[in-house]
Curated annotation (Swiss-Prot):
Tyrosine-phosphorylated in response to EGF and to cell adhesion to integrin ligands. Keywords: Cell projection, Coiled coil, Cytoplasm, Cytoskeleton, Exocytosis, Methylation, Phosphoprotein, Synapse. It is found in: Cytoplasm; Cytoplasm, Cytoskeleton; Cell projection, Axon; Cell projection, Dendrite. The modification Phosphothreonine is found at residues 86, 658, 671, 918. Residues 19-45, 404-415, 595-607 have a biased composition (Basic and acidic residues). GO terms for biological process: behavioral response to cocaine; exocytosis; negative regulation of cell adhesion; negative regulation of protein secretion; negative regulation of protein tyrosine kinase activity; positive regulation of dendritic spine morphogenesis; positive regulation of protein tyrosine kinase activity; postsynaptic actin cytoskeleton organization. This is SRC kinase signaling inhibitor 1. It comes from Rattus norvegicus (Rat). GO terms for molecular function: protein domain specific binding; protein kinase binding. Residues 520-531, 1036-1045 have a biased composition (Pro residues). Residues 332-341, 348-366 have a biased composition (Low complexity).
Length: 1197
C-alpha cells in the first residue's frame, strides 16, 4: 500500500471528524420543510422569548399518543407526553437567514482547515502531492453526499411508537427524581449571552413554541458534579446547549472545549438505561440527564486515552441494549458501504479498511471500550506527527461480533493507552475513572507486535465487543459463523480479508516472529505491510476482574481456576518462528499454503470461543476457588517471555500475561518444525459438545440459585408478615385494655391511692421531725434547765397546726377513696370466695353421685335376685348403718333424698324396760295433705331465701365499715388457709350431759316441749320462740327466714311414758341418712345457699343448685306434716346430726347481722346436741306385726 493512500484516508477521516461538530446545524437543513412556512404566534403566549437565537432543528409535528398524527412521519422518539400540537414550523426570516449564514461560515471554516491540512501533507510528502490533490478534489465532490448521509433517516421509520415515547418519558421523570438531592446550580432561571460575537444561538423564536417545547428541568453531569437547571424556553440547537453547559461549568468547560472532537455530550435513554451521543436537541425533554464527557488534549490522539476530569460512569457505556430504537437502521451504514469488500491491496495494515466515513453510529458497534461513540475509529487526529516516525498502529475498528452478540452483556474496556501493548500491573488502569479497565466487565488486553512499550503504531489497538453470550451460540451457528462469514482465506492473500477489516496484535510473545526476516521472504509480522492478523487469535480472549484486582503478571485466583476448564490452542516452540514459506500459528506472518488453512481456522475459532466461555464460566462459579501459586505465574520481561518456555495448549492473553487454559491441546506431532498440527473435525465437535454441556450445566445451576433466592425471599416475606400480624395484635390488645372501663377505673383508683399514700408519708415524716424536735427541747429543759425561747415554741406550734390541718384534709379524703376501692375490690372478694367454696361444692356433687350409684346398684341387685330382705334384717343392719352414716356424714354436704314414700310413725319401746311399744297410727287421710303443704312451704322457703339474699346484698352494697372490715379479714384468712377444719367445732364447746330427769314426763305439744328439756334451762325463754315458728310453718302466713333453717331436725324424736327419748322413723336407716343429708345441706354456709337462691334474681352468678335444695325442702315439709298427723301425745326429740352441728358452730360467727340472735341460739343448741350424740346408744327392738321397723336412740347411763 502506498503512503499517499494512507495520507488520503487520514485526511478524509480528520476532515469528517473536524467538521462533524461544526456542521450539525447545517446538516439539519437537509430535513424536509413544512409547506406552511411560518405561523402566527399564539395570542395567549405572547411573552417575549428569553433567548433570541436561530433554530436549526428539524420540522416536526406533535401527535397524540393515540396515533392521530399526519402519516408515519413526524413521530419523535421522545415526545412530551400529553402535548397535542400540530402547528407547522414557525421560523422568522431572520432565523432562516442566520441559519444560512451560519452554515456557510462553518462550511468555509471546514474547507479552510481541510485545505491547510492537505497543504501540510503535500509539503511533507512531495512525492505524493499529485495523489493528495486528487483526493482533495474528490473530497470536495463527495461533500453533499456526506451531509445527505448524515440525515436522520430514523425520523421516517419510527413514527409508530407513541407508546414507547410515553414509557420513556415516564421513566425519564422517575429516574430524574433521584437526582433532585444533588447540587443545584446557583443561577437564575435563564442565562444570557454576554459575547456579542456569538452568532450561533437561536435569534428569534415565537413565545408559544419556545414555552411549549421548553424542557423545564435538565440535569447536567460533568465528572463528579451534577447541576440541575430550570429552563423556561426550548433548547433549539446544540450551540444553545453548549452555551448552557459552558455557563453551568464556567471554570471547567468552554465553548471551544465543547465543540472539540475530544468532548462528547451524552443523553440518557431511560427506557434502556443507556447513555448515547446527543445528535438532535429534540431528544432533550423535561428531566433529561445530559452527561459531558471530555478527554484531556494530551491523550486525545489515542482512542483509549486517559480520563482525568471526565467521569465516564458505567451507565454511559454499559448499554443493556442498543442506544435507541430509532437509530438501529443506520448502525451499519457508515461502515458497511466502504468496507463491503477486502481492503485495497496497497492499504497498510495500520489503517482499517472499514473506517466509518460518517459520524460514529450510537450503537454498541461504535463503543470503543469505555469511550463514547465520538472516539470509535482510528487515531487520526495527529496522524501527521506519527507518519514520519513510527509505523502506523494496527487501528481500532468495531468488532464484527458486536452485531450478533447479546446486548445485555457489558462491553469490554479497551486497553489502548500510551503504548499499544502496555502491560497492566496489579489493577493499575489507564482510565482514571472508576469504571475503566478494572471494572467488572471483561478486559481485552492488546499486545504489541513489536516492542510493547513503543508508540501505538508498533502494536496497534484492538477493540472488541463483549464476548458472545452462551445462549446466543449453538455449535452449528458457531461453526457456520466461523467457516462461512468470518474466514475467507486465500492461498496467498490475507487470512481475514472480511468486510470489517479487523486487525489483531499477536496473541502472546511466544508467537512473535523474528523481526529480521530472511531476504526474499515475507516482511516481518509486525511490519505495516504484513498481511492482516488472525481474527481468532487468543488476544481476543478476555478475562474478568475476579477478586480484588486483576493483573497481567499475577492473575487473580479466579483466573487461575481456569486452568482446569479449557485451554487455548498453542504450538510447540518449533512453530513459533516460522520459516520463509510458512505462516505463524496465529496468523501474524505471511500467508500460508491453503492445505492446512481449514485446520488452523478451526483451531483459532476454538481459541476464541474457549476464551469467551472461560471468562464467563470461571468468573461465575470458580471465583477465588483456588489459591494462587507462584508456579502458575509467568513473569515477562519487556512484555515477552522466553521462547524456550512454550506452554502447550495455552495461548497467553497478552505479552507477559498468565496463560489462560483452554480445551485439551491437540496432539503435538513429532514432525519437523514446519509441519502444522492436524486437528480432526471430530475433535472439534467433541470440544464444542463439551462446551455446550458445560454451559447447560451452568444454566441449570444458575436457575437453582435463582429458585433458592426466590424461596429465601418468600420465607423472609412470610416471616415479616407473621411478625407484623403478631405485633399489630399485641398493639390492638394493649389499646383495648387501655379502653376497658374497669381497667381504666382501676388505674385511676390506683393513682389516687398512690397520691394518698405519698401525702400520708409526707405528713408522717413531718410529724416525726416535729416529735424529735419537741423531745429534744423537752430533754434540754429537763436536764439543763435551759429556758426555751418563745419564738421557737411558736414555730413548733405553727408546724403542728399545719400538720393537723393537712391530716384533717387527708382524713376527709379517705372515705371517698375507700368507697372507690371497695367498688374495685368487690370483684376480687367474690373471686376469693369462689376459690374457697368451689372445691367443697364439687366434692359434694361427687359424693352425691357415689350415693346414687350405690343405691342404684343395690336396687339392681335386689331386682336381679328377686329377693327382698326381711324387715328384721333391715333392723339388724340399721344400727351399724346409722353409726357408719353418722361418722360418714361428718364431712358430707349433700345426700340423695329417699326414694321410698313416707310411712306412718310408730312408737318403739325403750330397751331398758323391755316392754313392747304401743303403736299409734295417725290418721291416713292427713298424709294426703302433705303435697299441698309441701308446695306452699316450698314457695315460702324460696321467698325466705330470696329475702335473705337481698338483705345480704343490701348490707354488702351499703359498705358499712364493720361489714367491710369483717369481709376483708375473712378474705385474708381464707387466702392464708385452705378449707377450714369442720371437726373443730364439736371439740371446742363441751356442754353438760343431758339426763332423762331433765325431761318432763309429758309433752302435750310435741315440738314445744323440746326446748324446755334443754339442760340447765339456759336461754329457755329465748328458745321458746324458735319452735313456735316451726309449728306455724304449715299456716299461710310467711315466717321470717332464719327459724326454719335454725331447727331443721326438731321432728322425729318422741318420749315414752317413762320419759325415755325415742327417735321415730318411717323406714330404715336410709331415711335417717337422708334426713341427716338434708340437715347438712341446709346447714351449709349462708353464702352458698344465698348464691343458689339468688340465681333466680341474678343470673350472672354461679350456676344454681336449686333442684336439690328444693327437693330436700319438700322432703322436710313432708316429714313435718306426717309428724303433725301422727298425734300430739308423742313428744318428739331432735334427730342429732353432729356434722350439721359442727358446720353451724363453725359458720355461726359468719352469719348475717340481722340473724345474730337466732344464730347464737342455733350454735348453743347444736353444741348440746353434739354432746348428746356422744352418748347415744342403739338397739334393734322386736318388730311387730303390720308395722314397719323403727329405730330407737337410748341415752347412755
Amino acid at each position: 500500500m502506498q503512503p499517499w493512500q494512507c495520507l488520503r484516508r487520514f485526511a478524509l477521516a480528520w476532515w469528517e471528524r473536524t467538521a462533524e461538530g461544526r456542521a450539525r446545524s447545517p446538516r439539519e437543513e437537509v430535513g424536509p420543510r413544512d409547506p406552511g412556512g411560518r405561523g402566527e404566534p399564539d395570542p395567549e403566549r405572547s411573552s417575549p422569548p428569553m433567548l433570541s437565537a436561530d433554530d436549526a432543528e428539524y420540522p416536526r409535528e406533535y401527535r397524540t399518543l393515540g396515533g392521530g398524527g399526519s402519516g408515519g412521519s413526524g413521530g419523535r422518539r421522545f415526545s412530551n407526553v400529553g402535548l397535542v400540537h400540530t402547528s407547522e414550523r414557525r421560523h422568522t426570516v431572520i432565523a432562516a437567514q442566520s441559519l444560512e449564514a451560519l452554515s456557510g461560515l462553518q462550511k468555509a471554516d471546514a474547507d479552510r482547515k481541510r485545505d491547510a491540512f492537505m497543504d501540510h501533507l503535500k509539503s511533507k510528502y512531495p512525492q505524493h502531492a499529485l495523489a493528495l490533490r486528487g483526493q482533495q478534489d474528490r473530497m470536495r465532490e463527495q461533500q453533499p453526499n456526506y451531509w445527505s448521509f448524515k440525515t436522520r433517516s430514523s425520523r421516517h421509520t419510527q413514527g409508530a411508537q407513541p407508546g414507547l415515547a410515553d414509557q420513556a418519558a415516564k421513566l425519564s421523570y422517575a429516574s430524574a427524581e433521584s437526582l433532585e438531592t444533588m447540587s443545584e446550580a446557583e443561577l437564575p432561571l435563564g442565562f444570557s449571552r454576554m459575547n456579542r460575537f456569538r452568532q450561533s444561538l437561536p435569534l428569534s423564536r415565537s413565545a408559544s413554541q419556545t414555552k411549549l417545547r421548553s424542557p423545564g428541568v435538565l440535569f447536567l453531569q460533568f465528572g463528579e458534579e451534577t447541576r440541575r437547571v430550570h429552563i423556561t424556553h426550548e433548547v433549539s440547537s446544540l450551540d444553545t446547549l453548549h452555551a448552557l453547559i459552558a455557563h453551568m461549568f464556567p471554570q471547567k468547560l468552554t465553548m471551544g472545549m465543547l465543540k472539540s472532537p475530544n468532548t462528547a455530550i451524552l443523553i440518557k435513554d431511560e427506557a434502556r438505561n443507556v447513555f448515547y451521543e446527543l445528535e438532535d436537541v429534540r431528544d432533550i425533554q423535561d428531566r433529561s440527564i445530559i452527561k459531558i464527557y471530555r478527554k484531556e488534549p494530551l491523550y486525545a490522539a489515542f482512542p483509549g486515552s486517559h480520563l482525568t476530569n471526565g467521569d465516564l460512569r458505567r451507565e454511559m457505556v454499559y448499554a443493556s441494549r442498543e442506544s435507541s430504537p430509532t437509530r438501529r437502521l443506520n448502525n451499519l451504514s457508515p461502515a458497511s458501504h466502504l468496507a463491503s469488500s477486502s481492503p485495497p491491496p496497497g492499504l497498510p495494515s495500520g489503517l482499517p479498511s472499514g473506517l466509518p466515513s460518517g459520524s460514529p453510529s450510537r450503537s454498541r458497534l461504535s463503543y470503543a471500550g469505555g469511550r463514547p461513540p465520538s472516539y470509535a475509529g482510528s487515531p487520526v487526529h495527529h496522524a501527521a506527527e506519527r507518519l514520519g516516525g513510527a509505523p502506523t498502529s494496527q487501528g481500532v475498528s468495531p468488532s464484527p461480533s458486536a452485531i450478533l452478540e447479546r446486548r445485555d452483556v457489558k462491553p469490554d474496556e479497551d486497553l489502548a493507552g500510551k503504548a499499544g501493548g502496555m502491560v497492566l500491573v496489579k489493577g493499575e488502569g489507564l482510565y482514571a475513572d472508576p469504571y475503566g479497565l478494572l471494572h467488572e466487565g471483561r478486559l481485552s488486553l492488546a499486545a504489541a507486535a513489536g516492542d510493547p512499550f513503543a508508540y501505538p503504531g508498533a502494536g496497534g489497538l484492538y477493540k472488541r465487543g463483549s464476548v458472545r453470550s452462551l445462549s446466543t451460540y449453538s455449535a452449528a451457528a458457531l461453526q457456520s459463523d466461523l467457516e462461512d462469514s468470518l474466514y475467507k482465506a486465500g492461498a496467498g492473500g490475507p487470512l481475514y480479508g472480511d468486510g470489517y477489516g479487523f486487525r489483531l496484535p499477536p496473541s502472546s510473545p511466544q508467537k512473535l516472529a523474528d523481526v529480521s526476516a530472511p531476504s526474499g521472504g515475507p516482511p516481518p509480522p509486525h511490519s505495516p505491510y504484513s498481511g492482516p492478523p488472525s481474527r481468532g487469535s487468543p488476544v481476543r480472549q478476555s478475562f474478568r476482574k475476579d477478586s480484588g484486582s486483576s493483573s497481567v503478571f499475577a492473575e487473580s485466583p479466579g483466573g487461575k481456576a481456569r486452568s482446569t476448564g479449557a485451554s487455548t490452542a498453542g504450538a510447540p516452540p518449533s512453530e513459533l518462528f516460522p520459516g520463509p514459506g510458512e505462516r505463524s500459528l496465529v496468523g501474524f506472518g505471511p500467508p500460508v499454503p491453503a492445505k492446512d488453512t481449514e485446520t488452523r481456522e478451526r483451531m483459532e475459532a476454538m481459541e476464541k470461543q474457549i476464551a469467551s466461555l472461560t471468562g464467563l464460566v470461571q468468573s461465575a462459579l470458580l471465583r477465588g476457588s483456588e489459591p494462587e501459586t507462584p508456579s502458575e505465574k509467568i513473569e515477562g520481561s519487556n512484555g515477552a517471555a522466553t521462547p524456550s518456555a512454550p506452554v502447550c495448549g495455552s495461548g497467553s492473553r497478552s505479552s507477559g500475561a498468565t496463560p489462560v487454559s483452554g480445551p485439551p491441546p491437540p496432539a503435538v506431532s513429532s514432525t519437523p518444525a514446519g509441519q502444522p498440527t492436524a486437528v480432526s473435525r471430530l475433535q472439534m465437535q467433541m470440544h464444542l459438545r463439551g462446551l455446550q454441556n458445560s454451559a447447560s450445566d451452568l444454566r441449570g445451576q444458575l436457575q437453582q440459585l435463582r429458585k433458592l433466592q426466590l424461596q429465601n425471599q418468600e420465607s423472609v416475606r412470610a416471616l415479616l408478615k407473621r411478625t407484623e400480624a403478631e405485633l399489630s395484635m399485641r398493639v390492638s390488645e394493649a389499646a383495648r385494655r387501655q379502653e376497658d372501663p374497669l381497667q381504666r377505673q382501676r388505674t385511676l383508683v390506683e393513682e389516687e391511692r398512690l397520691r394518698y399514700l405519698n401525702d400520708e408519708e409526707l405528713i408522717t415524716q413531718q410529724l416525726n421531725d416535729l416529735e424529735k424536735s419537741v423531745e429534744k427541747i423537752q430533754r434540754d429543759v429537763a436536764h439543763n434547765h435551759r429556758l426555751v425561747p418563745g419564738p421557737e415554741l411558736e414555730e413548733k406550734a405553727l408546724v403542728l397546726k399545719q400538720l393537723g390541718e393537712t391530716l384533717t384534709e387527708l382524713k376527709a379524703h379517705f372515705p371517698g377513696l375507700q368507697s372507690k376501692m371497695r367498688v374495685v375490690l368487690r370483684v376480687e372478694v367474690e373471686a376469693v370466695k369462689f376459690l374457697k367454696e368451689e372445691p367443697q361444692r364439687l366434692d359434694g356433687l361427687l359424693k352425691r353421685c357415689r350415693v346414687v350409684t350405690d343405691t342404684l346398684a343395690q336396687i339392681r341387685r335386689q331386682v336381679d335376685e328377686g329377693v327382698w330382705p326381711p324387715p328384721n334384717n333391715l333392723l339388724n343392719q340399721s344400727p351399724k348403718k346409722v353409726a357408719a352414716e353418722t361418722d360418714f356424714s361428718k364431712g358430707l354436704d349433700f345426700e340423695i333424698p329417699p326414694p321410698s314414700p313416707p310411712l306412718n310413725l310408730h312408737e318403739l319401746s325403750g330397751p331398758a324396760e323391755g316392754t313392747p311399744l304401743t303403736p299409734k297410727s295417725g290418721n291416713p287421710t292427713k298424709g294426703l295433705d302433705a303435697p299441698s303443704k309441701r308446695n306452699m312451704d316450698k314457695a315460702v322457703s324460696v321467698e325466705a331465701a330470696e329475702r335473705d339474699w337481698e338483705e345480704k346484698r343490701a348490707a354488702l352494697t351499703q359498705y358499712s365499715a364493720k361489714d367491710i372490715n369483717r369481709l376483708l379479714e375473712e378474705t385474708q384468712a381464707e387466702l392464708l388457709k385452705a378449707i377450714p377444719d369442720l371437726d373443730c367445732a364439736s371439740k371446742t364447746h363441751p356442754g353438760p350431759t343431758p339426763t332423762p330427769d331433765h325431761k318432763p314426763p309429758k309433752a302435750p305439744h310435741g315440738q314445744k316441749a323440746a326446748p324446755r328439756t334443754e339442760p340447765s334451762g339456759r336461754r329457755g325463754s329465748d328458745e321458746l320462740t324458735v319452735p313456735r315458728y316451726r309449728t306455724e310453718k304449715p299456716s299461710k302466713s310467711p315466717p321470717p327466714p332464719p327459724p326454719r333453717r335454725s331447727f331443721p331436725s326438731s321432728h322425729g324424736l318422741t318420749t315414752t311414758r317413762t320419759g325415755e327419748v325415742v327417735v321415730t322413723s318411717k323406714k330404715d336407716s336410709v331415711f335417717i341418712k337422708k334426713a341427716e343429708s338434708e340437715e347438712l345441706e341446709i346447714q351449709k354456709p349462708q353464702v352458698k345457699l344465698r348464691r343458689a337462691v339468688s340465681e333466680v334474681v341474678r343470673p350472672a352468678s354461679t350456676p344454681p343448685i336449686m333442684a336439690s335444695a328444693i327437693k330436700d325442702e319438700d322432703d322436710e315439709e313432708r316429714i313435718i306434716a306426717e309428724l303433725e298427723s301422727g298425734g300430739g301425745s308423742v313428744p318428739p326429740m331432735k334427730v342429732v346430726t353432729p356434722g350439721a352441728s359442727r358446720l353451724k358452730a363453725a359458720q355461726g360467727p359468719a352469719g348475717s347481722p340481722d340473724k345474730g340472735k337466732h344464730g347464737k341460739q342455733r350454735t348453743e343448741y347444736m353444741r348440746i346436741q353434739a354432746q348428746q350424740q356422744v352418748r347415744v346408744g342403739y338397739q334393734a327392738p322386736r318388730p311387730l306385726e303390720g308395722c314397719t321397723p323403727r329405730l330407737c336412740y337410748m341415752p347412755l347411763s
